[in-house]
Amino acid sequence: MPGILVRPDQSFEEAYRLFKKQVDRNLIVTEARARRFYEKPTERRKKEKIAARKKMLKRLYMLRRYESRL
């Protein structure tokens, strides 16, 4: 769980910026949005499969693009 200790010489804006950075690193907002509604295990697997396919196609595209430059 993110948390920061505010020093006496630290402004609120700086402390808030550090807190936001920690929240982003820990993916708290993303996880909260994902858990907002129940997702069936089959739907989750389907999304993971689609994401894996997109990732593979992107890598393949980048590899072919790189090889064409050689």
Curated annotation (Swiss-Prot):
Keywords: Ribonucleoprotein, Ribosomal protein. It comes from the Bacteria. GO terms for molecular function: structural constituent of ribosome. InterPro entries: Ribosomal_bS21, Ribosomal_bS21_sf. One of its GO terms (biological process) is translation. Coiled coil: none annotated. One of its GO terms (cellular component) is ribosome. Belongs to the bacterial ribosomal protein bS21 family. This is Small ribosomal subunit protein bS21. It comes from Nitratiruptor sp. (strain SB155-2).
